[in-house]
């Protein structure tokens, strides 16, 4: 656990120092693809196909996610990013999660299932992938349709394609929820291109890419705090 958090902190600090919301670099030049001498234990992200979300679709998302994380963490060797994302076994959404009046699945119930599957092993952040409509109670509304939800911080997220106008934006929702799981809140600035902006029920991921300077700073502080905490345990 300590090594994994140090690894996450390391790649986050590199990202915050080296990436910008504008011109993106493939990075990796001159660093090679060799793994660290003491590689992290476990994986950072497990992509979990749910229901009719196919393994092939999950693999396609993984490829895109690895590519985009390569842009974001542009100082990190490609092999590190490759090793941090994998596709897990397919799983069905429990029938108990279904809210029949709106034919939606409670996202909180899905998170509980994903969390319990690994017995609370926080070395793996599991992201459930579904085509079904998912919901939670938020913004003063009961059973509000959403694109994603995660524990913040925590070891489980769920994302849905149901409300996405462009399926190509799924990687953005995935990164948004993953960063929530690391403890990063919604963006508080008027920065429409920031991936951490709250959608507020609107599908605006098509215009989002990267993090604003405030969110970079917040993520740096979160990861530095976690690194210090586990160095002292």
Name each model-derived stretch.
Residues 143-169, 185-233:
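Metalloprotease/metallohydrolase-associated module, dominated by Zn2+-dependent proteases
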Residues 40-57:
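Fold-level signature of zinc-dependent metallopeptidase catalytic domains
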Residues 20-22:
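Bacterial signal peptide processing site
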Residues 179, 183-184:
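Active-site-flanking alpha-helical
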Residues 6-11:
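Sec-dependent N-terminal signal peptides
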Residues 16-18:
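C-terminal motif of bacterial Sec signal peptides marking the signal peptidase cleavage site
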Residues 55, 59, 63-173, 185:
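Metzincin-family zinc-dependent endopeptidase catalytic domain
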Residues 1-4:
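Positively charged n-region of N-terminal signal peptides that target proteins for export
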């Amino acid at each position: 656990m300590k090594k994994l958090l140090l690894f996450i902190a390391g790649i986050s600090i590199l990202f915050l120092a080296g990436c910008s919301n504008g011109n993106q670099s493939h990075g990796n030049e001159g660093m090679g693809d060799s793994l660290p001498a003491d590689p992290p234990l476990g994986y950072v992200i497990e992509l979990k196909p749910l229901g009719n979300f196919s393994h092939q679709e999950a693999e396609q998302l993984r490829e895109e996610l690895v590519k985009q994380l390569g842009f974001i963490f542009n100082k990190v060797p490609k092999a590190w990013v490759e090793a941090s994302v994998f596709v897990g076994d397919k799983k069905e959404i429990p029938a108990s999660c279904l809210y029949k009046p709106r034919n939606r699945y409670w996202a909180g119930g899905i998170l509980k299932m994903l969390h319990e599957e690994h017995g609370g092993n926080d070395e793996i952040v599991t992201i459930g992938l579904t085509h079904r409509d998912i919901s939670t109670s938020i913004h003063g509304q009961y059973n509000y349709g959403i694109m994603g939800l995660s524990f913040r911080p925590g070891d489980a997220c769920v994302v849905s394609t149901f409300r996405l106008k462009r399926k190509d934006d799924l990687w953005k929702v995935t990164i948004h929820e993953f960063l929530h799981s690391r403890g990063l809140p919604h963006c508080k600035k008027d920065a429409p291109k920031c991936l951490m902006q709250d959608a507020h029920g609107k599908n605006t991921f098509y215009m989002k890419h990267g993090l604003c300077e405030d969110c970079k700073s917040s993520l740096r502080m979160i990861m530095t705090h976690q690194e210090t905490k586990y160095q002292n345990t």
